[in-house]
């Protein structure tokens, strides 16, 4: 599976690993799991170091619509992305721009350790 995740209610933390080609459908499955498990307010560490983003402009707009609906109705927790490649950085920045208006902190890091330290300092 291109996106794998672990939801830890005890830590109020979701750890995500995107590996290989990631499609809109993959992203939607992950988001659905967050909603079903009431994990939207949890801290999220998203490791994109091995990700190959595959999304058309239309698919990004679809994802944006979904994200704006979530922002309007659900509280989102702090979000830390781990990115090491320029093509993935562009994709992640587009994703972040889709959820402008969300009040949660979002930051991009180059290592999982940096991201985890930052997330550990965030209140949820």
Predicted regions and their residues:
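Amphipathic, Lys/Arg-enriched alpha-helical "gate/interface" segment within cytosolic domains
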Residues: 1-124
